[in-house]
């Protein structure tokens, strides 16, 4: 066991507009070089586009997108007697949220729309409707876990 002190989790404050902690975390993932105000403009702009196009509450669409992208199981490498097995394990709630946010932002960055807010809005709308690159990533992860179900007894 390590003797080092485990780093304390910093408190994340709710965002000023919607009062949502998940949205703040999302902004932190969008942020580059510590430019929080730019990240806020991008995220709020994307949510406005979502509201305009879908005529739905944007924060609801955002949460639907996160729920649809969050993986239930993933595979982790486990070495047993010279062989490395991909062992399927359940994803903890905290990691589930982090992966969903990471995959959603990554998919948005890889899109072809002109501005980041347009890309983010499009990916959020796709994810809330169970389409898009981020949802495909989750499906691939689940498929990997399903394919390696035989090794689930190596779980730790």
UniProtKB/Swiss-Prot annotation:
Single biological process term from Gene Ontology: translation
Gene3D superfamilies the record matches: Ribosomal protein S7 domain
Keywords annotated in UniProt: Ribonucleoprotein, Ribosomal protein, RNA-binding, rRNA-binding, tRNA-binding
Molecular functions (GO terms): rRNA binding; structural constituent of ribosome; tRNA binding
Keyword RNA-binding appears in the UniProt entry: yes
Keyword Ion transport belongs to the record: no
Pfam families noted in UniProt: Ribosomal_S7
SUPFAM superfamilies: Ribosomal protein S7
Family annotation (InterPro entries): Ribosomal_uS7, Ribosomal_uS7_bac/org-type, Ribosomal_uS7_CS, Ribosomal_uS7_dom, Ribosomal_uS7_dom_sf
A cellular-component GO term for this protein: small ribosomal subunit
Quaternary assembly: Part of the 30S ribosomal subunit. Contacts proteins S9 and S11.
Homology family: Belongs to the universal ribosomal protein uS7 family.
Functional note: One of the primary rRNA binding proteins, it binds directly to 16S rRNA where it nucleates assembly of the head domain of the 30S subunit. Is located at the subunit interface close to the decoding center, probably blocks exit of the E-site tRNA.
Protein's UniProt name: Small ribosomal subunit protein uS7
Organism: Maricaulis maris (strain MCS10) (Caulobacter maris)
Species lineage: Bacteria, Pseudomonadati, Pseudomonadota, Alphaproteobacteria, Maricaulales
Name of the gene this protein is made from: rpsG
């Amino acid at each position: 066991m390590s003797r080092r002190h485990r780093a304390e989790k910093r408190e994340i404050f709710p965002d000023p507009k919607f009062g949502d902690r998940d949205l703040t975390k999302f902004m932190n993932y969008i942020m580059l070089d510590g430019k929080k105000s730019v990240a806020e403009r991008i995220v709020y702009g994307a949510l406005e586009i979502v509201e305009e196009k879908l005529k739905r509450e944007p924060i609801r669409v955002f949460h639907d997108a996160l729920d649809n992208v969050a993986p239930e199981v993933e595979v982790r490498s486990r070495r047993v007697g010279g062989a490395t097995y991909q062992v399927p394990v359940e994803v903890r709630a905290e990691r589930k949220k982090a992966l969903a946010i990471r995959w959603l932002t990554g998919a948005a960055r890889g899109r072809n729309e002109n501005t980041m807010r347009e890309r983010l809005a499009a990916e959020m709308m796709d994810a809330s409707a169970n389409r898009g690159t981020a949802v495909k990533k989750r499906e691939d992860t689940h498929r990997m876990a399903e394919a390696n179900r035989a090794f689930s007894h190596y779980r730790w």
